[in-house]
């Protein structure tokens, strides 16, 4: 024993070796190997364990699920801004497209606290709920609209205009385009033109507007031969307002050898449109354009002689004085267009019907300012609402054919009147005025329960353009 103690005291290295050997011999009883240990206990490894995150490639679970991440951290994972943005929109506040809010086949794109619908062709609106064809709001076109074969809106403009950069608006290409007064006044507008398209729904409207207006030459206006004295040629504006100089530059007055007798409207530099019943064979007619106050010379007037009159080929005064009541006058020399002499616009048949259905046109002239009263000196104008056909038919014992329409006020007091015949009924559309009617006839003037009767211009648009060479 003494010898052993001496050896251990003198040989500490031997003791160390002995202890290590003992421990190694007992390890298998305490620890399992790596493979068996993982079968008993699994624990997710923390990705930031042992290494700096700045030096580890981005991982979506580490960056944005275990912890709240920033956009930049998410960008490290996707390494693409577009993909990161798509993820971020849902990550921040959930998927706004989950309820599928887009209608009519629209594709929903999620955004932060909102969403965006990518609409199919022909639809628009926040949820693609609106028909974007010409049926609704005229396809947002300011004048004419048509649908292409693939249901896209194609806007166009009348003569003297072209499409603006937005492909919706129309801008003039000539100094004095049709239907525009170039002199502006601070007073109120004649009509509420700015609301025309926004308030109209054209779906199936053309069926309601288009009419069967073929009338045989033998058709007779009921009782017209017996009661013609009760019909007054429309030559006045009762209850209207004084126009401003240049406010209605397409208006003309027709002078006979003795006095003025009818009105008319400028179609172009060489042609005037008026009522056929104003014309009498052999009469000499002088047209005065740029007129304002017929009792004064204002140096804006242009006087032209009529060298040819063309009543509509179906007009026959001996059979019916007011059916097809429209005529064209050819001037001896062209008018000089300026701020006081400007033509009215003439649309195609379809759009002339549509514009008429807007329901708010206006008439103008120097006719009598009250029933059986004096003739106006200053050009008058009056807004006249369109009257539905059923009401119009009930208001009179005379036949109202489909080439006519009624406009005016049931309460009376406002109307076109004797002396206004042949003048224009105009509808203003987004700041441009279009011819929609011709003042024709009525029972007395501004009587309660009676309306003014107008020639429906849409029936004669093709004829007007053919004869006056408008394209």
From Swiss-Prot:
Tell me where in this chain the PTM Phosphothreonine is found. Answer: 206
Enzyme Commission numbers on file: 3.4.21.22
Positions annotated to bind Ca(2+) 6: 82, 86
The main place the protein resides is: secreted
- Gla domain location is 47-92
Q: Does the keyword Signal apply?
A: yes
Q: Which residues bind Ca(2+) 4?
A: 61, 66
List the active site: 277 (charge relay system), 325 (charge relay system), 421 (charge relay system)
List every position bearing Phosphoserine: 114, 205
List of residues that carry 4-carboxyglutamate: 53-54, 61, 63, 66-67, 72-73, 76, 79, 82, 86
Q: Which residues bind Ca(2+) 5?
A: 72, 76
Tissues in which the UniProt entry reports expression: Detected in liver.
Which part of the chain is the Peptidase S1 domain? 237-469
Residue sites binding Ca(2+) 1 per the record: 47, 53, 63, 67
What modifications does the entry list under PTM / processing?
Answer: Activated by factor XIa, which excises the activation peptide. The propeptide can also be removed by snake venom protease. Activated by coagulation factor VIIa-tissue factor (F7-F3) complex in calcium-dependent manner.
Binding-site positions, Ca(2+) 2: 48, 53-54, 63, 73
Q: List the disulfide bonds.
A: 64-69, 97-108, 102-117, 119-128, 134-145, 141-155, 157-170, 178-345, 262-278, 392-406, 417-445
UniProt xrefs under PANTHER family: COAGULATION FACTOR, COAGULATION FACTOR IX
Function comment:
Factor IX is a vitamin K-dependent plasma protein that participates in the intrinsic pathway of blood coagulation by converting factor X to its active form in the presence of Ca(2+) ions, phospholipids, and factor VIIIa.
Of which family is this protein a member?
Answer: Belongs to the peptidase S1 family.
Protein name in UniProt: Coagulation factor IX
Q: Which organism is it from?
A: Mus musculus (Mouse)
């Amino acid at each position: 024993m003494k010898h052993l103690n001496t050896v251990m005291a003198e040989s500490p290295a031997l003791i160390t070796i002995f202890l290590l050997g003992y421990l190694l011999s007992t390890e298998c009883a305490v620890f399992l190997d790596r493979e068996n240990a993982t079968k008993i206990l699994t624990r997710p490894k923390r990705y930031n364990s042992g290494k700096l995150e700045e030096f580890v490639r981005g991982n979506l679970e580490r960056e944005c699920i275990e912890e709240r991440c920033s956009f930049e951290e998410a960008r490290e994972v996707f390494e693409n801004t577009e993909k990161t943005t798509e993820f971020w929109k849902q990550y921040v506040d959930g998927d706004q497209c989950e309820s599928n809010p887009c209608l009519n086949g629209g594709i929903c794109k999620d955004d932060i606290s909102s969403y965006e619908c990518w609409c199919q062709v022909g639809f628009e609106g926040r949820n693609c709920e609106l028909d974007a064809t010409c049926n609704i709001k005229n396809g947002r076109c300011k004048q004419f609209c048509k649908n292409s074969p693939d249901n896209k809106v194609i806007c166009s403009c009348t003569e003297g205009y072209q499409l603006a950069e937005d492909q919706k608006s129309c801008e003039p290409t000539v100094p004095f385009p049709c239907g525009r007064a170039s002199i502006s006044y601070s007073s109120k507008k004649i009509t509420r033109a700015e609301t025309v398209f926004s308030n109209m729904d054209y779906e199936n409207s053309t069926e309601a507007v288009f009419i069967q207006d073929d009338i045989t030459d033998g058709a007779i206006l009921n009782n017209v031969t017996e009661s013609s004295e009760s019909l007054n040629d429309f030559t006045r504006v009762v209850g209207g307002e004084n126009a401003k100089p240049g406010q209605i530059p397409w208006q003309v007055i027709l002078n006979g050898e003795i006095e003025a007798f009818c009105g008319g409207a400028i179609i172009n530099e060489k042609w005037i449109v008026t009522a056929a019943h104003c014309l009498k064979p052999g009469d000499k007619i002088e047209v005065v354009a740029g007129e304002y106050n017929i009792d004064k010379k204002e140096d804006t007037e242009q006087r032209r002689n009529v060298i040819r009159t063309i009543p509509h080929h179906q007009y026959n005064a001996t059979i019916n004085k007011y059916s097809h009541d429209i005529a064209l006058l050819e001037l001896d020399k062209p008018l000089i267009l300026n701020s006081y002499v400007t033509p009215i616009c003439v649309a195609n048949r379809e759009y002339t019907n549509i514009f008429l259905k807007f329901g708010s046109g206006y008439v103008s002239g120097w006719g009598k300012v009250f029933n059986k009263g004096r003739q106006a000196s200053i050009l008058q104008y009056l807004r006249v609402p369109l009257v539905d056909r059923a009401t119009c038919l009930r208001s009179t014992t005379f036949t109202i054919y489909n080439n006519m329409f009624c406009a005016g006020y049931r309460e009376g007091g406002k109307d076109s009147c004797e002396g206004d015949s042949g003048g224009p009924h105009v509808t203003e559309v987004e700041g441009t005025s279009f011819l929609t009617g011709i003042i024709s006839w009525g029972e007395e003037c501004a009587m309660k329960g009676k309306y003014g009767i107008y020639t429906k211009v849409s029936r004669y648009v093709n004829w007007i353009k053919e004869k006056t060479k408008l394209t």
